[in-house]
Structure formats: C-alpha cells, structure tokens
C-alpha cells in the first residue's frame, strides 16, 4: 500500500483517517470499526463491502 494514498484517502462513512492492516490487506477505520478490503491492490471503499471489526481487533 502506497503511503501517499493513505495520506489522501478517507473513510467513506465518517471521512476519518484510515490505517493499513498488512496482515489482512485491509484499510481500517478505527472510528467506525470497519475494514475495507483490497482487491488486486485496489481499495474497495464501499460500506457494503466493509468487514465490521470485532471489539478486540484494531
């Protein structure tokens, strides 16, 4: 994941900052507790495609 993309991309739900979870290859919004998948290196920024994060996962 290009760090420059992380500087400009935002959560589509709250417009908050995202972090990259390398283990799961997801962009994570800690505010909404959603993880957006990457498919073929392209972020899928649809709320309907996001995975809800369990309380213990960041």
Swiss-Prot record:
GO annotation, cellular component aspect: cytosol
Superkingdom of origin: Bacteria
Entry-linked SUPFAM superfamilies: Trm112p-like
Gene3D superfamilies: 2.20.25.10
InterPro entries per the UniProt record, alphabetical: Trm112-like
Family: Belongs to the UPF0434 family.
Record protein name field: UPF0434 protein NT01EI_2448
């Amino acid at each position: 994941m290009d760090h420059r993309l992380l500087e400009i991309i935002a959560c589509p739900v709250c417009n908050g900052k995202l972090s990259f979870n390398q283990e799961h290859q997801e962009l994570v919004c800690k505010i909404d507790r959603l993880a957006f998948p990457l498919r073929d290196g392209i972020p899928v920024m649809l709320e309907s495609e996001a995975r809800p994060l369990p309380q213990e996962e960041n």
